[in-house]
C-alpha cells in the first residue's frame, strides 16, 4: 500500500490485514468466509521473560510453529493480578476441544522457559488494564517489526509502563501516564512510527482525527474505516472474534 503491491494471501486474518496494511486497503476481488465451530474449552499458558525482545522472539517462534493459536499477547507483569517473577509476561491463548487444548498446553510448556504454567483465559487483570483500554493509544505495525518498535517506545519510559502487544495482529495499546498529554505523545512518537512503518490511533476522542492529520499528514485511514465496516457487518453484535474471521 502507498506504492506497494497488496498480495493475495489465502486464509488472511481480518485483524492482521487491518494492521499489516497500515490501514490502507487495496481492491478486494473475492472474499471467502469460513465459519468455525464455537470453542468448548478456553485456557492459556503464561510465561515470564526478562526483556521484551526475549518475549517477542519466543512469541514469533510460537506463531510460526503453531498457526492454530487463538492469541499471543505480551504485557508487563504489573497488569497481572498475580505477577510473574520476570518483568515481561507472555500469554498464549487457546480455544478448541478439550483434547486439543490439553495437547497444546503440553507442547507450549515444553517450548516456553522453565516456570511457565497453565492458566485460565481470559485471566483477571489489575486496574491498570482498564486504564490501557479506556485511554490507550493504539499502534499497529507489521508483526515482524512490532517487537523492535515496542522496545524503543519503552526505552524512554518508567519500568512498569502499561502496554499490551498482540503478536498475531501487530497491534499494541499504550497508556501514557497523563492522558491529557496525548498530542505531545503523538508528536514524540511520530518519527519512531514512521521509521517502523507503523501508525497510531486513539479511539473515543472526537478531536483525535483532526490532531492525527496534523501529526501524521502522510497517513491514509480510509482503508481502516472500511475494514471496521466489514467487521461490523460480519459481527453486528460486537462479539470479540479476533483470529476467527478468515479471508
What are these regions (language model features)?
Residues 27-32, 65-80, 123-125, 155-162, ...:
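Short amphipathic beta-strand starts and helix->beta connectors
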Residues 110-247:
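Conserved glycine-rich FAD pyrophosphate-binding loop
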Residues 1, 55-62, 101-105, 149-153, ...:
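Hydrophobic side chains in well-ordered alpha-helices
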Residues 35-45, 85-91, 169-173, 208-213:
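Active-site-proximal beta-alpha loop/turn segments in soluble metabolic enzymes
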Residues 1-68, 73:
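FAD-binding subdomain of flavoenzyme oxidoreductases
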Residues 12, 39-42, 67, 84-89, ...:
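Short gly/pro-enriched beta-turn/loop segments at secondary-structure junctions
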Residues 32-36, 48-50, 95-97, 142-144, ...:
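Solvent-exposed residues in well-ordered beta-strands and their adjoining turns
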Residues 42-44, 48-51, 57-118:
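A conserved active-site cap/scaffold subdomain adjacent to cofactor or substrate pockets
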Amino acid at each position: 500500500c502507498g506504492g506497494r503491491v497488496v498480495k493475495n494471501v489465502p486464509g488472511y486474518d481480518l485483524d492482521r490485514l487491518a494492521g499489516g496494511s497500515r490501514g490502507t486497503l487495496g481492491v478486494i476481488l473475492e472474499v471467502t468466509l469460513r465459519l468455525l465451530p464455537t470453542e468448548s474449552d478456553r485456557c492459556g499458558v503464561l510465561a515470564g521473560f526478562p526483556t521484551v525482545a526475549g518475549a517477542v522472539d519466543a512469541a514469533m517462534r510460537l506463531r510460526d510453529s503453531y498457526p492454530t493459536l487463538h492469541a499471543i499477547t505480551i504485557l508487563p507483569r504489573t497488569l497481572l493480578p498475580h505477577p510473574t517473577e520476570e518483568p515481561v509476561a507472555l500469554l498464549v491463548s487457546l480455544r478448541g476441544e478439550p483434547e486439543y487444548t490439553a495437547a497444546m498446553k503440553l507442547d507450549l510448556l515444553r517450548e516456553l522457559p522453565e516456570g511457565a504454567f497453565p492458566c485460565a483465559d481470559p485471566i483477571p487483570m489489575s486496574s491498570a488494564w482498564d486504564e490501557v483500554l479506556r485511554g490507550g493509544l493504539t499502534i499497529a505495525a507489521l508483526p515482524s517489526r512490532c517487537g523492535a518498535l515496542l522496545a524503543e517506545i519503552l526505552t524512554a519510559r518508567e519500568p512498569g509502563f502499561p502496554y499490551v502487544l498482540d503478536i498475531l495482529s501487530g497491534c499494541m495499546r499504550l497508556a501514557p501516564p497523563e492522558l491529557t498529554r496525548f498530542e505531545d505523545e503523538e508528536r514524540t512518537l511520530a518519527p519512531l512510527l514512521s521509521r517502523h512503518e507503523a501508525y497510531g490511533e486513539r479511539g473515543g476522542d472526537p478531536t483525535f482525527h483532526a490532531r492525527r492529520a496534523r501529526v501524521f499528514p502522510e497517513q491514509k485511514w480510509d482503508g481502516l474505516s472500511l475494514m471496521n465496516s466489514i467487521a461490523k457487518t460480519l459481527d453486528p453484535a460486537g462479539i470479540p472474534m479476533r483470529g476467527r474471521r478468515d479471508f
